[in-house]
UniProtKB/Swiss-Prot annotation:
The keyword DNA-binding applies. Gene3D superfamilies: Hotdog Thioesterase, Winged helix-like DNA-binding domain superfamily/Winged helix DNA-binding domain. This is Transcription factor FapR. Keywords: DNA-binding, Fatty acid biosynthesis, Fatty acid metabolism, Lipid biosynthesis, Lipid metabolism, Repressor, Transcription, Transcription regulation. CDD domains: hot_dog. SUPFAM superfamilies: Thioesterase/thiol ester dehydrase-isomerase. The keyword GTP-binding does not apply. It comes from the Bacteria. HAMAP family: Transcrip_fact_FapR. One of its GO terms (biological process) is negative regulation of fatty acid biosynthetic process. GO terms for molecular function: DNA binding; DNA-binding transcription factor activity. Transcriptional factor involved in regulation of membrane lipid biosynthesis by repressing genes involved in fatty acid and phospholipid metabolism. Belongs to the FapR family.
Amino acid sequence: MKRKKQDRQRHLKETIDANPFITDEALADRFGVSIQTIRLDRMELSIPELRERIKDVAQKQLDEVKALPMEEVFGEIVDLQLDERAISILDVKKEHVFSRTGIARGHYLFAQANSLAVAIIDDDLALTAKATIRFTRQVKAGERVVAKAEVQKVERDRTLVVVNSFVEQELVFSGDFLMYRSAQEQ
């Protein structure tokens, strides 16, 4: 459905504000226009390209991962509030998928969610004690997975972290991670 330029640009800004990780291709599909039109609209509205938007979100990251080295985190953490919430993104590439079907291997989605659950813990030691996971939709090469983690409950040496992963706005993975941590000081 084509819209008038001003209306389209207003909706474009709202869409990007709601999901800064959305690609120009996805926006073009959503608004029924060419990728070039989306890029021109972004330029007119002074909205940076995807890479710059990701960097902007990452610069707002307030806390530093304690429980594991950054190079061991699977996916790129773009927001982190220790013991509260975290967000990471994973661009699914051909090395992440089965060659015959083009569907992402489940352990990559689990690795992204699990490493985010470890990273969110405000402790030098964090281990997964138990995980209950659900895959709700297949993920294919070329899709971007945005994982959002939230701490639900903190006890002496256990923390419950809930992770939901999305492609666009569609849930593709969810998990409840019971994390072991060294006992918190009282």
